[in-house]
Amino acid sequence: MNITKATRWRVFAGVWLQSLFTSATAYFSLFCIPLTTKFGWSDSAFALAYTIYMFTYCAVGFIGGSLAEKISPRKTIYIGLCLFAGGWFLTGFASSIPQLYVFYGLMAGAGGGMIYPACLPTALKWFPDRSGSISGLVQAGASCGPFIMSPIAQTLIDRVGAQMTCRILAIVFLIGVGIAAAMIVPCPEGW
């Protein structure tokens, strides 16, 4: 691979895009009313899925970071992506609270927890001269995700229902993060 200054910007773009897509948990509340109404779940039981997601995301972060160092950031992202997109896809079939907790809370949470710590350190290694700015810009990607995707998700929920929307979003995440991961390469020693 020919390493140039453009390479680091390509890596940054991939990291920024993954941040945009994996910030989906920020608009998971859009699914509350349709799913609790359809299945008779309580709001608090539904909300616990988000808590489980965030706990799992944080708990698995160490594993994601360690794997990225051992096998490569890209491979770690792909493993996390399978869990993340798979969890969202299976959430589209969940008809009970335990299924919601396993598919969204544990599976999607574990996937997100593997993706982010594989991405951010990789971007920062490419930009030792701008680590603060790059970190902030990656975080901006996470903020743009809900801003861009919430209206799309709400439109899909209104047109095809919450469960089908979960499945559609899973496919979007699979494609989007898959493309983003292809842009991410480890920083060579001495860069």
Predicted ranges, named:
Residues 7-27:
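Pair of pore-lining "gating" transmembrane helices in MFS-fold secondary transporters
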Residues 20, 87, 98-114:
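Hydrophobic core of transmembrane alpha-helices in multi-pass small-molecule transporters
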Residues 24, 107-119, 142-144:
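Core transmembrane helices of Major Facilitator Superfamily
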Residues 26, 54-62, 147:
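Residue-level signature of mid-helix packing/kink "hotspots" within the transmembrane helices
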Residues 34, 65-66, 155:
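Membrane-interface helix termini in secondary transporters
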Residues 35, 105, 113-127, 134-135:
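Intracellular juxtamembrane helix-capping segments at the cytosolic ends
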Residues 59-98:
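Conserved MFS/SLC helix-loop-helix module at the cytosolic interface between two early adjacent transmembrane helices
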Residues 141-189:
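Helix-loop-helix hairpin linking two adjacent transmembrane segments in secondary transporters
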